[in-house]
Amino acid sequence: MQTKIFYLILFLLTAIFSNIQSNDFLTLQSTTSTRDSGFYDFILPEFKKKFNIDVRVVAVGTGQAIKNSENCDADLLIAHHKESELKLINNGFGLYRKEFMYNDYILVGPKSDPAFLKNNVSIESALEKIQNHKLLFISRGDDSGTNKKELSLWKKINFLPNPQTDKWYLSVGQGMGASLNMAVNKNAYLITDRATWISFKNKRDHAILVENEPLLYNFYGVIPINPEKCPNVKYNESKKFINWLLDTKTKEKINSYKLNNQQLFFTNIKK
């Protein structure tokens, strides 16, 4: 009898301990660029050290990350397409948005530059040249923040690419790394975020051709998921994370992150 009681108590203690352990993490739906650049590996150990809370990152395109958040598969969201993020808030799933850092987009292509883009052309002029000369262009085509940004830039020159009829425009449905590899292998043009480009090792004969334009700024926002819509959300832990992310020391940490002696993200937000 005593043996049965002992094992029952042991079982209950194990269940309680497991439940406590299982709550010591946050699920963060995220864009892929912050993961692929090594950003989370750089900053998240500091959060874990301070609060003893793990952050489990689910890195997908921004569109999918928002869908996952609407399915209540998140405590937090980090994305980089403000219009889509505000829609999540307006639909009641996100509570608010805090913009906390930025980098920028760039247009990369073959160093031979058949479109002659490197002569200080604007991004609109560059895309017009690519379209007019029907030069091979790779689009992520995955509803990510980068894909949405790219399409908005085509819209500025009153052009909507159609992969069915515009054979030079390849919509590949892939993440940033795979899309970059394809662009390099096919000698094609592509829009990418700078952080992923800096960390990308297979550049070969590709180079940055258009950069440093206000139109190409890339802003990142963090959004806590609404516990009234998603009862399992760990809201108190989410608040801790956001307050920590916006803290001066964390901003200094983010600004210090470099690869190849180049800063990847900036917390002094430009407007």
Task: State each model region's role.
Residues S18-S22:
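Boundary at the C-terminal end of the N-terminal hydrophobic targeting segment
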Residues M1-Y7:
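Bacterial N-terminal signal peptides that target proteins for export
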Residues Y7-I16:
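Bacterial N-terminal signal peptides
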Residues S69-E70, K98:
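Short glycine-biased active-site loop of nucleotidyltransferases that positions the nucleotide triphosphate
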Residues L107:
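Serine endopeptidase catalytic core focused on the charge-relay Asp
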Residues N23-K50, G63, K67, D73, ...:
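Exported/periplasmic ABC-transporter solute-binding proteins
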Residues L76-Y102:
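Acidic, polar ligand-binding/catalytic clefts
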